[in-house]
Amino acid sequence: MINLFLLKYKTAFSTFLKPFAYLSLILSVCFYSIQAQAFPVFAQQAYENPREATGRIVCANCHLAQKPVEIEVPQAVLPDTVFEAVVEVPYDLSLQQVTGNGTKGPLNVGAVVILPEGFTLAPKDRISSELKEKTKGLIITPYNEANPNILVVGPVPGKDHQKLVFPVLSPNPAENKNVHFIKYPVYVGANRGRGQVNPTGEKSNNTVYTSPIDGQIVKLEKSDNVTSFSIKSKTGDIITVKVPFGPDILVKEGQTLVADQQLTNDPNVGGFGQVETEIVLQSPARVKGLIAFFFTVILAQILLVLKKKQFEKVQLAEMNF
């Protein structure tokens, strides 16, 4: 009797928990999908520094198409000053990209700004209300603890953030002996849209797929999220190519192929770009000295003019006499 009661209780309890199990699974999948789009995280986990020795920013390893990007910073800044670094990521807002599940959706954007050593993200209490409004909706973070001068942001909706504003705090050489009053380079990389290569090295569903060999498609099979091509080579070997949903299929079963022939179109509408500029950390003493020099020159000019007029009056008086 007790065993029967326990069996019924166990069955009822399992039935009660089943919807929660499904809900948990759905939430975990959704959470994973959201995290899978967080492309700056991949670079942060794989590279200690996003700029390689060749000068290339590592985002280009996954975002293969080249697109323009612009950076705007002041020509010069004083020490311990908050200023704006504005990254522009232009693209056609009417474009739609292939999302992770193969459907079409809007593009997102992201950027990395590699500042000189000592330059950091401005503290919240140093940011003006106007600058806070410009950075609304952006979560800007240092690349890692070892590189607080490297700032990353994204992915964020591109329709709202074609201009990414970074609030930056300049260093003070009086407090940091590694910083000097000189001209420094600033490197910027920015992308719009998803990458063509996953961090694992596999192709994403946002790129073109080609045939690896000469042969014939003997079988073309579609499942829930993958299209499988069975290609028979001239030697009789069967090679299977799996294409995730997203790209449009350009071939059909029975078709003869040559190596590197496209099996799909290229759905990518985004791309990555990098650019560099320069900024001067200006000494206040130099600025004061320059102002004093200009004042001295102007004062000398005024005195010279007054002296000249006085001399002319003396000459005129002597002539009249």
Curated annotation (Swiss-Prot):
Main localization (coarse): plastid
MF (Gene Ontology): electron transfer activity; heme binding; iron ion binding
Span of the signal peptide: 1-38
One GO term describing the cellular component: chloroplast thylakoid membrane
Subunit composition and interactions: The 4 large subunits of the cytochrome b6-f complex are cytochrome b6, subunit IV (17 kDa polypeptide, petD), cytochrome f and the Rieske protein, while the 4 small subunits are PetG, PetL, PetM and PetN. The complex functions as a dimer.
Function: Component of the cytochrome b6-f complex, which mediates electron transfer between photosystem II (PSII) and photosystem I (PSI), cyclic electron flow around PSI, and state transitions.
Protein name from the UniProt record: Cytochrome f
Organism (species): Guillardia theta (Cryptophyte)
